[in-house]
Amino acid sequence: MAGGHPERRLIVTRLTEAEKIARMAKLLSQKQGLALPRYQEIKHAAELALDMLRKSLDAFARLDVVMAAQVVRQDDQVDEEFRAIMRYLITFMMEDPRTISTSLEILFVAKAIERIGDHAKNMSEYVIYMVKGRDVRHVTVDEIDREIEL
């Protein structure tokens, strides 16, 4: 098959798509004139997700399990940002029901960012599997660190 390994092409295509989504979400959060509740948290989560994507692509290209493990660790940060945004938006909507529509749009953006982080984490777990031959999808970060040291 011309053009390289089919699995790699599939993964790179999927991550390229996710990176575009993350950039769009980041741009949306930076729009001038939009009063976005939790703007800084959304921006921070988008930056983290983009960083995770870059690192996961690099880890894949280099088969770098150390960098892949860093991405897995970062996923907790993106998840926490999402939970904080969600808690705030729920409170915001309860206090003023007129904000429900805007809050839901923001929540969808935040969830998209969180899912991008999840995809980068999955990619990084796959890198560890390719190099070490062990499925680390359902183990702790500490166990992954121990696996890498072997």
Spell out what each predicted region is:
Residues 1-150:
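Cytosolic, long alpha-helical scaffolding segments
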